[in-house]
Amino acid sequence: MALTQGPLTFRDVAIEFSQEEWKSLDPVQKALYWDVMLENYRNLVFLGILPKCMTKELPPIGNSNTGEKCQTVTLERHECYDVENFYLREIQKNLQDLEFQWKDGEINYKEVPMTYKNNLNGKRGQHSQEDVENKCIENQLTLSFQSRLTELQKFQTEGKIYECNQSEKTVNNSSLVSPLQRILPSVQTNISKKYENEFLQLSLPTQLEKTHIREKPYMCKGCGKAFRVSSSLINHQMVHTTEKPYKCNECGKAFHRGSLLTIHQIVHTRGKPYQCGVCGKIFRQNSDLVNHRRSHTGEKPYKCNECGKSFSQSYNLAIHQRIHTGEKPYKCNECGKTFKQGSCLTTHQIIHTGEKPYQCDICGKVFRQNSNLVNHQRIHTGEKPYKCNICGKSFSQSSNLATHQTVHSGNKPYKCDECGKTFKRSSSLTTHQIIHTGEKPYTCDVCDKVFSQRSQLARHQRSHTGEKPYKCNECGKVFSQTSHLVGHRRIHTGEKPYKCDKCGKAFKQGSLLTRHKIIHTREKRYQCGECGKVFSENSCLVRHLRIHTGEQPYKCNVCGKVFNYSGNLSIHKRIHTGEKPFQCNECGTVFRNYSCLARHLRIHTGQKPYKCNVCGKVFNDSGNLSNHKRIHTGEKPFQCNECGKVFSYYSCLARHRKIHTGEKPYKCNDCGKAYTQRSSLTKHLIIHTGEKPYNCNEFGGAFIQSSKLARYHRNPTGEKPHKCSHCGRTFSHITGLTYHQRRHTGEMPYKCIECGQVFNSTSNLARHRRIHTGEKPYKCNECGKVFRHQSTLARHRSIHTGEKPYVCNECGKAFRVRSILVNHQKMHTGDKPYKCNECGKAFIERSKLVYHQRNHTGEKPYKCIECGKAFGRFSCLNKHQMIHSGEKPYKCNECGKSFISRSGLTKHQTKHTAESLKTKFNVEKPLDVLLTSGFK
């Protein structure tokens, strides 16, 4: 589809002839020329593109020998915007003088008569009536301007008409020059010749004639434009159908009408005498060559007095000055919106018609303007013809280059009158000003959401359609926005073009650099009204407020799960699709989002850039550092709406909520077991597969969990370099030593809010809290019994299997749990590291010391809800509560009798043992038999 690009001027559609060329045309061609040029002018005026200059020359008519007079008509409008001058020039050979008269509304004007071989350059009313002589011209030339009355009134109130500059217009000695009424839009010029002794009269039509002229019975259904004759309507409709049946054999250009093709073909038959010495381009007029040369020289002779900006063309300066004056002379009849340029109005009017005639051949996308199509096609071709002379960066659009160059210059000429903020582009200023007005004229048809910019609406609509037209050539990933594709490509290239002036850190995106700079300035302007927390960006505050409101506006279409951030929803959807687009080059592990890959890469590098200012602990992720700091501050911003419990982390709150809902969304397909967390399901699945997906390429080990791989990477040899100065025990990690030393020092920094009990680690505190919440997330598959701790469940499972893997080397006794073996071994060594400060009694286990100390303090923190009785140990409370519930979980296999405690069952089972011995040895005292026989 051959369509023109850019704003159209009258020069683009005008064909000019020299005297020799004009003589070579036959009368039919001359008549055709007049008709076409007049029609072109009408069309330009209708589109709001007012030509700078239009010249019509009527060649000499007749022969002076036969009594006919030769005459030439020239209509010209100068470039100045507030003055439009038209001139009539008539060459006279046999006349002595001339009187000239025209009407302007109800006022008559007369010009001074002119004698033969004299010039007349007059203004309206400049000459007196006495100067007018009685002898008149033999022929009459009448120009009738047909227009609407409202348009006539509009033009009559504007400006003034003044004489032609003689330095620009050369007039023959035997010619008359006089300003005429300006030509109005939709003008029609009727030229007639009479051989009578009358004044030369230029008149406007009467009101009756205007009524008759306005009748246009043929209307276009596409745009509503009306025509007087049906042939004009047929020609016009080709604009909508884009049909161009008339094609030039020379260059292939197509036209709606045959007459336009005829005029166009003259271009090929005549020369272009003005050639550029730099690039060889040729032009028909010298003025065009002069303007073109400025593109090579960079000359910008037209300077703005307000801001000093320079331009190569005067009309560009005139348009620019409207920024300062605020003038917007072009108004849309549909919505009343005004524009600085007629071309902008033309572009805007397509919004109302919905017409998008320009289509991309590759992806089928349609556009309102050809320039937009050309820019769009560069996405497919990758063409970037505009290069920055300073840094060499290339761009697909000249506007992007202009915007980029302001980075080097720092120039921000566009200032907001409301708040004083400055911008590099006028479009950015226009967008910014909507913040003050609050205007959001663009509405989504699907969800009725409103936007301040059309581009924002277009981006939003892709969330409904799912359209992702921008594809990465490296990995095939698709995106809904070009900016996302550009940012994504930097993952492959490693490019980080945005550098911080303060610390030198580089970023892939400008927005990340802006966010980073706030670290140096510490500027946080947006404060939360609920908790007082401040943020550097309003978007961060909006996201934070959802924590308090519980708003989760983003819903998964597959499982119905809701999220408070759109990014979280996008990552969640990959669970259903199985997509893991981010792969580690070191070990081949794949991830659903880039942040997980970035964190994982630090396992290989060992990098931990985030350090706690309080305790010096380092982290490989900023989120982990933020979470860690809450240990010191005690901050718990996440509260459960059901029970009011508060949490330090949102993940803990989400996990806790499932206690109330009973939700277990993660189900094993093999055995049907369900879990509240996906990580728990992942760990469980390894039981069935036996898979160890986390491989160490350095030392060859394989692990079930990534955390174990990370732990192994930190200490692959199993070395324990960290030694306790109190007891000599060694640890592989400093954290293990830190927790251990608290046993000696008695430091317990973690306190339970419910009962005040203190603990030396967060994990112990977390386990303890389940006592108050009643949470028992670990269930036995064999008997259905639930437990608060995973270790307790593991210990319980050995009851069913009978497995006792931990054997004492001293006495050979076996145990189900390693911790019990450790405590047992202290009986052989006599080691009792936990000593009571009150009475000096020592204990093997710290828990025994804690229980013992309650004898001195009288503390009984565990209280029965039923009867109010308090206990020093939780196990005692458990046993007591069975009295109220009637539960007896320990059953004797011999007689079926049940007991509240294991000790009660053990005591009971000795009765059966004694009875069997009594029967076997037939004695009354089986204990004596046991002592003498040694249990044989």
Curated annotation (Swiss-Prot):
* Keyword annotations from UniProtKB, A to Z: DNA-binding, Metal-binding, Nucleus, Repeat, Transcription, Transcription regulation, Zinc, Zinc-finger
Query: Would I find Zinc-finger among this entry's keywords?
Result: yes
| PROSITE patterns in UniProt | KRAB, ZINC_FINGER_C2H2_1, ZINC_FINGER_C2H2_2
Q: Where in the cell is it found?
A: Nucleus
User: What Pfam families does its record include?
Assistant: KRAB, zf-C2H2
What's the main place this protein lives? nucleus
C2H2-type ZnF: 218-240, 246-268, 274-296, 302-324, 330-352, 358-380, 386-408, 414-436, 442-464, 470-492, 498-520, 526-548, 554-576, 582-604, 610-632, 638-660, 666-688, 694-716, 722-744, 750-772, 778-800, 806-828, 834-856, 862-884, 890-912
What are the KRAB domain coordinates in residue numbering?
8-83
Any one GO cellular component localisation term in the record:
nucleus
InterPro entries hit by this protein: C2H2-ZF_domain, KRAB, KRAB_dom_sf, Znf_C2H2_sf, Znf_C2H2_type
Give one GO molecular function term: zinc ion binding
Q: In which domain of life is the source organism classified?
A: Eukaryota
What does the entry give for GO biological process? regulation of transcription by RNA polymerase II
Q: What is this protein's function per UniProt?
A: May be involved in transcriptional regulation.
| Record family assignment | Belongs to the krueppel C2H2-type zinc-finger protein family.
The protein's name in its UniProt record? Zinc finger protein 836
Name of the gene: ZNF836
